Structure formats: structure tokens, C-alpha cells
Regions:
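Cross-family detector of peptidyl-prolyl cis-trans isomerase
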Residues: 1-134
Length: 134
């Protein structure tokens, strides 16, 4: 993917505008979007200080998979404050057992620098299942 950050950003913005109009998609004040895929059984929401265990599958808006705990077959645990802003915010809306698709604008992800396989200014999509909160 050799597109410029500006091109990625514009395509991401266009994607988010169209995506935001879809049924069930919620757009928050920050620009994060999410869609509940499966309701959870929990009642508590994680806070920014929580440690969570999740399964996730991350793609670019063109469907390219860049990271997936699902494909590795092993969930991941982390402190919420250690991850990108889109996850910090998105996971606070979730409860245990819930599956959500997060649509994360680049400014809430890796921004202009990108990261590894993630190009500059890329909008990211993550399917996240919240397994547990500690």
C-alpha cells in the first residue's frame, strides 16, 4: 500500500460518512463509530484503568487483515490505558461477552505515522469480543 497519508485519510473520512448512515452504527463525539454484533451478558463496563481480555480481528477499510488474535487462536490481555484511543473509548461502551465492530478514524488510531503494516492516516476496523474485565 503506497498511497499517501492524505489519500488514506480522505478515503477513511468518506468511508466513515457512508458507514455512519448504516443501520445500527453509532457515531460518538470523537468520531469513533461502533456497531454491536452480539449482545453481552455482563453488566459492568471497563474503565480506562481496567485490564481487559479480548479477542479481536483488525482490518483496513479495504479488508486487508493486519492483526488478529482470532487467527492466532489466543485472546490478548492488556490495560486499557496502553492501547490506541479508539480502543480506550470503544471498549468502555462494552460489557463482558459482547461483540462489537469498531470503526476507528486515524486520529484515534496510529495517525499520520501508521504502525508496521498499518499505513499512514489509515481508518481501522476491529471486531472485538470482550471476554473479561479485571
Amino acid at each position: 500500500n503506497h498511497k499517501s497519508g492524505d489519500e488514506n485519510f480522505e478515503q477513511g473520512q468518506q468511508f466513515l460518512i457512508e458507514n455512519g448512515a448504516k443501520e445500527g452504527v453509532v457515531t460518538t463525539e470523537s468520531g469513533l463509530q461502533y456497531l454491536v454484533l452480539e449482545e453481552g451478558t455482563g453488566t459492568e463496563h471497563p474503565t480506562k484503568n481496567s485490564k481487559v481480555t479480548v479477542h479481536y480481528h483488525g482490518t483496513l477499510i479495504d479488508g486487508t487483515v493486519f492483526d488478529s488474535s482470532v487467527e492466532r487462536g489466543e485472546p490478548i490481555s492488556f490495560a486499557l490505558k496502553q492501547v490506541i484511543k479508539g480502543w480506550q473509548e470503544g471498549l468502555t461502551y462494552m460489557v463482558e461477552g459482547q461483540k462489537v465492530r469498531l470503526f476507528i478514524p486515524s486520529q484515534l488510531a496510529y495517525g499520520k505515522g501508521g504502525s508496521g503494516p498499518i499505513p499512514p492516516s489509515a481508518t481501522l476496523i476491529f471486531d472485538v469480543e470482550l471476554i473479561s474485565i479485571k
